[in-house]
């Protein structure tokens, strides 16, 4: 049984928060429900480290759920944000910075001809789906079980991330009407997608998929899966929406598409971006083919708007982050991710803990299962989440902050150095022993929570 360590300041803050905030947190996975104990309230971050309200410092392997690819408080980002704040926080008008950020995205991601800035990944996917329906004149959307595209009503069916962490098959408040035009299929099952297109192709507006699924744990697309979706969409006149909120500008300068689609010669019609492109501030985007984006207001009839879209502070952080993301940064992140994943897997193996490492570029996670492969949501759910909780708390006590859910991706930054890797290596064996002490049979989670 896991006995979480005391954290008096965080415990008091959590009690206060529970009185005024539902569940005590502003995004469900942060509540530690999946691992037990009290969430740590962080007060500062610097490089690869976080400091909590009790003054304890942790090596951060969450990186704000992806955005902090350069590490916390990166000097270039801090300087850019400070400079932007000093001249005003929001104008409600176009700004030079938003043009520069749009130009940078278009330059880095070849298929993106035009892009619209928004404030969150949820807004980006919601708007992309609306645009796809407006462009095609069709209503049906195909999504995949375990893939999370934000808390959009139509896309919460069999969603991953927080929905999975909390074990929710769906959520109250989402009506049947909202999901009536959503078809949910198993991830990586191209044959079934083809069968649905044969039956209902004339009604399908778009297929939306994570470029590499990372909200049920990390489950990469099988070879040919994304390209096959492109082929089927072409045959039946549907659009392909590639959700790169997590992978965009983190896997490479051109995201997952840059490592797969650019090489295999396929492109989606629309992309969604977030996380890294905001440098830790609320910023996201959707973009793609010029003829599709031309249907968006004010150029076209499909309406989308936002008071703080293109906010100059978030734009400044995003520009500074993307400009600092050189090939050297991506190489460092790839190396550190491989180092950490290898260390953890070795420790678990030495203690006889059944597990399956899984990665997509520098995103990685571990399924606590004896399965040889995990290719979809059902496989991701069939794992011993209690063992993960034991591993999590042992690492937390050793000053290593992991995702508080077995269904979330792990992240490193360019700031993670040899010392941080050595400390992780020193902590992993005890954590593996803690996981090994949790007995079988496997504790099957009913489902993953939503992006944090």
From Swiss-Prot:
NCBIfam families: hemL, PRK00062.1
Catalytic activity: (S)-4-amino-5-oxopentanoate = 5-aminolevulinate
Organism in which the protein naturally occurs: Frankia casuarinae (strain DSM 45818 / CECT 9043 / HFP020203 / CcI3)
Cofactor: pyridoxal 5'-phosphate
UniProt xrefs under InterPro entries: 4pyrrol_synth_GluAld_NH2Trfase, Aminotrans_3, Aminotrans_3_PPA_site, PyrdxlP-dep_Trfase, PyrdxlP-dep_Trfase_major, PyrdxlP-dep_Trfase_small
Protein name: Glutamate-1-semialdehyde 2,1-aminomutase
High-level lineage: Bacteria, Bacillati, Actinomycetota, Actinomycetes, Frankiales
GO annotations of cellular component type: cytoplasm
EC number: 5.4.3.8
PROSITE patterns named in the record: AA_TRANSFER_CLASS_3
Domain of life: Bacteria
Membrane-spanning ranges: none
Gene: hemL
GO molecular function: glutamate-1-semialdehyde 2,1-aminomutase activity; pyridoxal phosphate binding; transaminase activity
UniProt xrefs under HAMAP family: HemL_aminotrans_3 (MF_00375)
UniProt entry keywords in alphabetical sequence: Cytoplasm, Isomerase, Porphyrin biosynthesis, Pyridoxal phosphate
